[in-house]
Amino acid sequence: MPKILIATKNPGKAREYRKIFEPKGFEVTTLLDLDADQVPAIDENGSSFAENALIKANALMNVTHATVLADDSGLCVDALDGAPGIHSARYAGDHDDVANRKKLLEALEGVPADKRTAHFHTSIVVVHPDKAPLE
């Protein structure tokens, strides 16, 4: 049975990926299934969602030697030239959703309601030892 490590600690995301991969015969593990010492600190310092997903996937593959699926996602607000973008989770500091929403609303002050458009972007990367990444 092929195995895949999903680079997430989010139980909801883990359920979603299991629903996709398990019916196709994959054994799915997530970061929740690993010992804490198996999960390296990962600095997602890329300049794009895809680059951050690749950084995360490679870091985990190098430690676990497993096939890894990683994603990076965020909110891209058109009136803010795509911000918060790759900085969505830490837009106002360290993973503070309330502060992030407050900062976003402050940044949108004066922007008419019909110009407050946005999209949620996700980039997914799969890496396998000795193979080129799939982006």
Residue ranges and their predicted role:
Residues 2-5, 11-31, 35-135:
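Anionic-ligand binding patches
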